[in-house]
């Protein structure tokens, strides 16, 4: 394959060890055959690290309120309490949705919501206990670092105290959302009222320290550049070296159509397909030996492009989901619910082995 000498040298090295930040930034700029070579190299590392299984989980998202005091410029989900289409689900209704989800096969509930005024750690604790008392076997993968931080502030608790309360109540793991781009200059534009980079890292490292594993995410394609993406992934890499608490990395392409910062002319219209493939491939090469699982979210990418991402370093396709109002509000057009049979079909179509998993990737069963 006719590729640049530097590209070839980096990719050959990547077969044996993680690439550096400088090498990752260089690879963010490759095109043509060099991009194809990057994708192939990442797929080879994926095979060495994670094998030929493509995993998925039967889960259900419950976004319990869209009322939020935050001011995130990428979010089209947020409403004020006075808005006609605002909503807040009472615990009884959440339990009804949980029962329906579990009846349909969900083994994980991912519960997140807006920063409803006054909600605190004790609210989240009571909600966890209510669900676990009714459904003791379901795994609760719930509450973003921002919700944890906000709830702790409102309860006048430290982050560590709050997390210990939630763990005792039955919280199994946390989504590593609210990361967006871990650069405070970028955050000042896209999410000025959200926790800072340092505060996000504090919540995540504390969660890992008290025994709550998390995922990690990166939302890109708005006002960020390649250097922000590489630095973000390097921050995640350093956390994982320290704690080992990340279960997977989930790239989240910016959904621009209804996002305020796009409508105001401040943001790009999302990442390109080449951008997406570079993120999947480079993350695989950066996280070598540290984060085994990289998710290609079909809700964000659609099944067709998710297949390409799965040939470029990713090894997980996400969940069946049930409902996912946040992406839908922002303009995602690929649906919010799928059946396992559809996931199995698209995985087999690329010559891989579909496998059903649990949240923490501890129980994996070929299907």
UniProtKB/Swiss-Prot annotation:
Domain Radical SAM core span(s) in chain numbering: 54-288
UniProtKB keywords: 4Fe-4S, Iron, Iron-sulfur, Metal-binding, S-adenosyl-L-methionine, Transferase
Catalytic activities: 5-amino-6-(D-ribitylamino)uracil + L-tyrosine + S-adenosyl-L-methionine = 5-amino-5-(4-hydroxybenzyl)-6-(D-ribitylimino)-5,6-dihydrouracil + 2-iminoacetate + 5'-deoxyadenosine + L-methionine + H(+)
Entry keyword Iron-sulfur: yes
One Pfam family it belongs to: CofH_C
EC number: 2.5.1.147
InterPro entries the UniProt entry points to: Aldolase_TIM (IPR013785), CofH/MnqC-like_C (IPR045567), CofH_family (IPR019940), Elp3/MiaA/NifB-like_rSAM (IPR006638), F420 (IPR034405), FO_synthase_su2 (IPR020050), rSAM (IPR007197)
Positions of [4Fe-4S] cluster binding: 68, 72, 75
Entry superkingdom: Archaea
Enzyme class: transferase
Cofactor note: Binds 1 [4Fe-4S] cluster. The cluster is coordinated with 3 cysteines and an exchangeable S-adenosyl-L-methionine.
Cofactor(s) needed: [4Fe-4S] cluster
Pathway linked to the protein: Cofactor biosynthesis; coenzyme F0 biosynthesis
Sample GO molecular function, one term: 7,8-didemethyl-8-hydroxy-5-deazariboflavin synthase activity
Residues that span the membrane, as ranges: none
Subunit and interaction comment: Consists of two subunits, CofG and CofH.
Function recorded in the entry: Catalyzes the radical-mediated synthesis of 5-amino-5-(4-hydroxybenzyl)-6-(D-ribitylimino)-5,6-dihydrouracil from 5-amino-6-(D-ribitylamino)uracil and L-tyrosine.
Recorded family membership: Belongs to the radical SAM superfamily. CofH family.
UniProt name for this protein: 5-amino-6-(D-ribitylamino)uracil--L-tyrosine 4-hydroxyphenyl transferase
Organism encoding this protein: Methanothermobacter thermautotrophicus (strain ATCC 29096 / DSM 1053 / JCM 10044 / NBRC 100330 / Delta H) (Methanobacterium thermoautotrophicum)
Gene: cofH
């Amino acid at each position: 394959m006719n590729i640049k000498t530097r590209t070839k040298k980096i990719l050959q090295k990547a077969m044996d060890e993680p690439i550096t930040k400088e090498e990752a930034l260089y690879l963010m700029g490759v095109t043509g055959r060099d991009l194809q070579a990057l994708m192939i190299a990442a797929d080879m590392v994926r095979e060495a690290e994670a094998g030929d299984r493509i995993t998925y989980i039967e889960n259900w998202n419950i976004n319990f309120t869209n009322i939020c005091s935050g001011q995130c410029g990428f979010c089209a989900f947020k409403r004020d309490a006075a808005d006609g289409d605002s909503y807040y689900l009472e615990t009884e209704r959440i339990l009804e949705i949980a029962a329906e989800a579990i009846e349909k096969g969900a083994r994980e509930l991912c519960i997140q919501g807006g920063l409803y005024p006054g909600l605190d750690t004790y609210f989240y604790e009571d909600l966890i206990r209510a669900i676990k008392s009714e459904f003791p076997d379901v795994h609760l993968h719930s509450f973003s670092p921002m919700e944890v931080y906000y709830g702790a502030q409102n309860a006048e608790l430290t982050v560590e105290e709050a997390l210990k309360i939630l763990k005792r109540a039955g919280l199994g793991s946390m989504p590593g959302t609210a990361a967006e781009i871990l650069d405070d200059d970028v955050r000042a534009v896209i999410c000025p009222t959200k926790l800072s980079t340092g505060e996000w890292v504090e919540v995540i490292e504390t969660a890992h320290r008290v025994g709550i594993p998390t995922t990690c995410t990166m939302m890109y394609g708005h006002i960020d550049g390649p250097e922000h993406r590489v630095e973000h992934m390097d921050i995640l890499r350093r956390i994982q070296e320290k704690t080992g608490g990340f279960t997977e990395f989930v790239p989240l392409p910016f959904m621009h159509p209804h996002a305020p910062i796009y409508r105001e002319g401040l943001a790009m219209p999302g990442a390109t397909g080449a951008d997406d493939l570079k993120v999947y491939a480079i993350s695989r090469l950066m996280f070598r030996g540290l984060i085994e699982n990289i998710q290609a979210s079909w809700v964000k990418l659609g099944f067709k492009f998710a297949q390409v991402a799965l040939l470029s370093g990713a090894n997980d396709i996400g969940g069946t989901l049930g409902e996912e109002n946040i992406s839908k509000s922002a303009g995602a057009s690929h649906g919010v619910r799928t059946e396992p049979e559809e996931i199995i079909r698209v995985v087999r179509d690329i010559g891989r082995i579909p496998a059903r998993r649990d949240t923490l990737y501890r129980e994996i069963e070929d299907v």
